[in-house]
Amino acid sequence: MKDVQLELYTRPTCSDCQAGKAFLAKHHIPYADHDLSKHPEKEKDLRKLTGTRMVPTFVFKEKSLLGRLRKPDVFIGFENNINEIRRIVMEVD
């Protein structure tokens, strides 16, 4: 199993965010949920990662063999990126 951490940037009114969360729950994938309505300071991190404020944003962080973090895989949107997200999740699952 890969050592992957997932951070998810969301807003409660975003239907694509809710679909992404449901998918992760179905597959029992742990993640850090950054609800931007509750933690507006996280928008700065989101902009730094993506250059935008769009949600949902999935950030998969993987450690190398030496324990260093590799460049994260970042996906904006669930529906448009479901195949890539599924591939990463199934590798971890």
Task: Give names to the regions the model predicted.
Residues 1-29:
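Local sequence-structure signature of Cys/Sec-based thiol-disulfide redox active-site neighborhoods
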Residues 11-14, 36-37, 79:
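Short, surface-exposed acidic/glycine-rich loop or hinge patches that mediate macromolecular interfaces
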Residues 36-54, 64, 86-92:
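Thioredoxin-like thiol-disulfide oxidoreductase module
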Residues 57-58:
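Short acidic loop-to-beta-strand element that houses the catalytic metal-binding Asp/Glu
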Residues 62-93:
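Non-catalytic, surface beta->alpha helical segment in thiol-disulfide oxidoreductase systems
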